[in-house]
Amino acid sequence: MIKRKLLGQHFLNSKSIAELIVNEAEISKDDVVFELGTGPGILIPLLCKKAKKVISVDADEQLTKKARSNFSQFDNLTLKSGDGFKKKDTFSIFVSNLPYSKSKDAIEWLAQKSFSHGVIMVQKEFAEKLIAKSKDRRAVSIIATYALDIKKISIVRKNNFSPPPKVDSVILKISKKTDLDKKLISLINDIFSYRRKTVKNILKQFNQQSTIEKRIDDLTGEEIVNLAKQILKK
């Protein structure tokens, strides 16, 4: 079994919080739900009772095998092992207690995927990054808020996990606004490596010209995305 600490993963052990996550996901019998991180499967019975189909993926093959044994009664459940970000499944709703080490990757992946909405649980510090303003923003903040509507649902205390993490978590509801392609996401990350420079000097790095003296921190999220689009057009 993959050591969970290597993945930064802590398993939810609270049924009431599991119910809150599933209720906030607003699942109908027409929905296909994609769960990243099967774990012990605390969400699976709740998801399967509401959805048309549930696809649950875990990086740990042993956990997937255990889930197949424990949840064989659900005909609408598909269990897979491997890297969930490489799966080609289509879905309408995304649900995940995101491993801390994979949270940024998950947001960038979701920004590229077409889906309706979802509920994710992330480390409190990471949640604050996603909704940060101005100088506290990171590239992932821009990517997240441009591609997604994000609403904070609840703080989840660390004693609701096994093993307990060092910090609390936050449940977020996300709704898809628009897709961002992989090249654009990569370029937004590159732009933030020059965040202390002016737009004029950033564009010089890409052999382009500008007279704009503003720094990245002075631009809106939309302006940063448009800057990346401008660079890609050349």
Label every PLM stretch briefly.
Residues K166, R196, K204-K234:
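Conserved Class I S-adenosyl-L-methionine
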